[in-house]
Each structure stands twice: as C-alpha cells, then as structure tokens.
C-alpha cells in the first residue's frame, strides 16, 4: 500500500504525532459520553465495527520503516475495552486496541472514545463518534432516526473525508502581519515532563446551556469565558509575577477552507491572561479576551500559522534520516512548541 491510497492518506501536520508518545506531548484526546443506561459492551463493539464500514479510513495502524512511520490497512476486528476509572491503562496502536489508532472503552454508564492525533482532530473525530453512538442506540433497540447530522450507514464514504486539508494551502503565501508577538510565559515546572509525582486529573462538569446563556448575556463566546477562568486558576497557582499566562488554543480551519475531511485540520493561536487582569472584574476580562481573539483570528493570520506548521512537519516527515534521529528531532519540535506557552486548551 502507498500513501496514494485514499484510505491511508493523512494530513501534512499531524504526522508529527506519529513520532511522539504520551511522555513527550499530549496526543491522545479523550471524549467522554455519559449514557442514561449501563453500557452494553457487545452492542457497543457491534456499533464500532459498523462505523468502520462507514469510515474505512479509520481502519489504520502504523508501522516503522528505516526512515519513517507509515500507515497500513488494519484488518483486525475492533475491540471495546473495560475502564475502571482508576488504574487500568491501555496503549493505542498496540495489541490492546488490535493496532487501531483509536480506542473505545466503557465503564458503567459511560463510553470513552480516544484517538491518536495523527489520524484526526476533535471536530473530525466527532463525526466518527456520532456514527458509533447512532449505531449503538439502534443496536440497543432505540427508535432513533438520522436527521442528517450523522454520517451514518445510510450515507456513503467519500475520499474527501480523508483529504489532506493543508494541500489547499500549497503554492500560496500568507502574511504574518498582525500576529501577536508573545513574551515569555508563566510556566509550572513541577508539573512538566520529568516532574516527580503521579498524574493529576481534575473534572469539572456543568450544563453547557448555562455557560452559553451567561456568555450571550454579556456579549461574548463560551471560549471567552472558559479560557480566562482556566488561565486565572493557573495564574493563582503558578503566577503572581509580571509574566502573562499564555494558553495555546486550537482553531478549526474548516470554516475558512470548507472540507469534509475528518483528518487533522487545525492551527494554534496564543491567548494571554495579562497580569493587569488580576484587578479587573471577570466580565471585563471576558470582553477583553473576546476582543483579543477577534484580532488574532483573522483569516490571513490563521492560514499563515497553518501553512507554516504543516510545511515544517511535512518536511521533517519526508526527510531522509534514520528513524531514531527523526523521532528525536520530531519530539524536540513538538516539546519546544508546547513549552513556549503555559498550557494547551
């Protein structure tokens, strides 16, 4: 198989994640779906197998060559894995998942779905999630109907769903004018790579409707509320100096360059929480955050960021160097990028 096979085609940018692990960068996001009833693993596994027929470009695994990682078709059966919520851990792409670069798990009334960032982004993976959940509900006997929002079994796969969105930027140049030149950010060395101590997970839940209604009442977006609140907490814990907390924010490029692709198609922008925000009312901080985002999310700036990052990652992936050296170089590129800012949202 070659990368000309549309089922094996992936994007220019996210190949960088093939050369990283959980020890170098967060590359396996988790989606948590809370159900009304206890999850039925047999019906869930059946749903995953059905969804793979609709999303055949998700039937991937990765294998090393002397100079790079490459994708190949995965013909193994799909699996769903029991979670205990505490100690059981699985490795995506290993025998745990039969080599698949995504994971589906369950615990009591909760379904967990994770993916390796080299094959998708959050917006793209949501399409696969919707199909799995829709099929699961059907398999359980619920009278669900597709209102057109699900790429279900009543629709056909298109090669554009595995398109490399960044190819739309080829042979084009964009200006970096107006991109905020960030200063040194606040960091938290005690929770970075190599720090002693176990992983800390904190979960905060609330109705999205309440967040949406509040944000609308003061004329901002939900992100303009959530992001500064998280940065304020980070500043309270690790800041207190004249340095800003800076969060990395992923931006979906599909509204700018429409595509059906479920592959990785984002760029990142930097969002600060300035020291002077400490003395301002929250509403004012939220409004200033909205204004900053509006200024930094101009089309030209976003496409410049996207092309620069994708070109750099593609060049490294295609470089003729031993795999061990390429892994080391890719991990340095990734960790240097992440450590420029305080944390990633």
Question: PLM ranges: what are they?
Answer:
Residues 132, 136-140, 234, 293, ...:
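Short, well-ordered alpha-helical segments in soluble proteins
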Residues 1-68, 76-103, 236-345:
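Acyl-thioester-dependent acyl-group transfer interface
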Residues 2-14, 110, 119-127, 131-213:
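Non-catalytic, low-complexity flexible loops and terminal extensions
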Residues 30, 119-134, 212-224, 301-323:
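Short flexible/disordered coil segments
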Residues 105-109:
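Elongated alpha-helical scaffolds
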């Amino acid at each position: 198989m070659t990368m000309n096979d549309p089922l094996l085609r992936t994007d220019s940018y996210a190949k960088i994640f093939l050369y990283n692990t959980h020890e170098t960068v967060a590359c396996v996001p988790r989606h948590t779906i809370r159900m009304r009833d206890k999850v039925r693993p047999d019906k869930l596994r059946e749903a995953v197998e059905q969804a793979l027929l609709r999303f055949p470009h998700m039937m991937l695994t990765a294998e090393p060559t002397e100079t790079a990682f490459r994708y190949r078709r995965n013909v193994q059966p799909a699996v769903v894995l029991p979670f205990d919520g505490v100690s059981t851990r699985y490795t995506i792409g290993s025998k745990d998942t039969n080599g698949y670069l995504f994971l589906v798990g369950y615990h009591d009334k909760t379904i967990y779905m994770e993916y390796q960032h080299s094959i998708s982004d959050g917006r793209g993976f949501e399409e696969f999630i919707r199909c799995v959940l829709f099929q699961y509900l059907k398999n359980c006997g619920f009278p669900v109907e597709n209102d057109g929002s699900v790429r279900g079994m009543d629709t056909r796969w298109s090669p554009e769903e595995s398109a490399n969105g960044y190819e739309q930027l080829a042979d084009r140049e964009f200006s970096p004018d107006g991109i905020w030149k960030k200063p040194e950010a606040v960091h938290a060395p005690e929770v970075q790579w190599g720090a002693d101590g176990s992983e800390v997970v904190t979960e905060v839940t609330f109705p999205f409707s309440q967040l949406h209604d509040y944000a609308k009442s003061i004329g901002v977006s939900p992100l303009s509320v959530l992001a500064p609140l998280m940065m304020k907490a980070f500043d309270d814990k690790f800041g207190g100096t004249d340095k800003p907390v800076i969060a990395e924010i992923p931006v979906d490029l599909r509204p700018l360059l429409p595509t059906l692709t479920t592959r990785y198609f984002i760029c990142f922008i930097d969002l600060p929480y300035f020291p002077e925000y400490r003395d301002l009312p929250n509403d004012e901080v939220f409004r200033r955050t909205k204004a900053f985002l509006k200024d930094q999310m101009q089309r030209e700036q976003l496409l410049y960021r996207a092309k620069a990052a994708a070109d750099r990652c593609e060049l490294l992936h295609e470089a003729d160097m031993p795999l061990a050296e390429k892994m080391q170089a890719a991990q340095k590129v990734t960790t240097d990028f992440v450590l420029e800012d305080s944390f990633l949202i």
